[in-house]
Amino acid sequence: MFNIASAPFAHNRKQTQTLMLLVILACLPGLLAQTWFFGWGSFIQILLALVTALGAEALVLRLRRRPIKPALMDGSAALTAVLIGLSLPPLLPWWMLVLGTAFAIIIAKHLYGGLGQNLFNPAMVAYVLLLVSFPVQMTSWLPPDTIRAYDIGFGDAASVIFTGFSLDGYSMAQLKQGVDGLTMATPLDTLKTGLNQGLTTGEVMSHAVFEGWGGIGWSWVNLGYLLGGLFLLQQKVINWRIPGAILGSLLLAATLGYLMTPDATATPMFHLFSGATMLGAFFIATDPVSASTTPRGRLVYGVLIGVLVYLIRRFGGYPDAFAFAVLLANLCVPLIDSLTRPKVYGARRK
């Protein structure tokens, strides 16, 4: 005799908490690389985001009269906090991070009904909110440690985040200076600014910050997230289609752009290993709630993100484009899933 159970018949043995913890664990190589090259700021921001996210989650659940402990223990709010902390500049003022994190949990997540019902990726909603509201602070990244004019320890990072000045009294504007006395920016930001000033790609990329595939420090940060992403694929936490489609389409678009206008476009390898490329491809775009769920839909979704990232980086007003690309793709998910839904056996074609 066979026991016939009710649908659904396909099950994922990994519980939500386990999946979230695996994703957080996979972030560690990238976090370690960020800490090594850019100081302790990201670590402090993650801790602050965790406190804010869990507090906001508990507050909303209490107001909605929902069980608090199970929701706090499922790891979803913690993962959102980690992704926000990793995405923001390490020395962003504390109140901006608190504002963005609270907005992600209260508005982007619970306004739509909570876990499993949000249309947009909460971490990217927070990022875009802060980028549009505070563009100067959101583009204030430190130079990598090898070309930084001032050493910044844990105490200095905490002091800048909470007071705006290091323990020695240096402001953020001073800390952004490189050893040559010039104010530094991320490789993507430096490239965008240089091209807008009429310089060629070769002239811009002669700057010291462009050492390596994606710039000093950024190549290693992206390699760290690539390593974490491969771990998630090996553990079957994420599907290969979304990151594969993103990286493949970004590589193809960047290659075509470079072949057509080499003096106005960065190399394909630069696009793959700079900015938030690997973090976005493996950890952000693969959010199971806001991403496409059909096999073909995941490929379309990933290609859309990859192409949008290149187009916004090349022609848009923001140096890195992953947050905007992911949110625009999230908006298209219902249509993508509708058009790529597998056919039901025996159903009539309309």
Swiss-Prot record:
User: Which GO biological-process labels does this protein carry?
Assistant: electron transport chain; transmembrane transport
Per the record's keyword annotation, is Membrane included, yes or no? Answer: yes
**Cellular component GO terms, alphabetical:** plasma membrane
Q: Which residues form a coiled coil?
A: none
EC number of this enzyme: 7.-.-.-
Write down a Pfam family by its short name: NQR2_RnfD_RnfE
Question: Which cofactor is recorded for it?
Answer: FMN
Quaternary state and partners of this protein?
The complex is composed of six subunits: RnfA, RnfB, RnfC, RnfD, RnfE and RnfG.
Give the protein name, as stated in the record. Ion-translocating oxidoreductase complex subunit D
Source organism per UniProt: Aeromonas salmonicida (strain A449)
Name of the gene encoding the protein in the UniProt record: rnfD
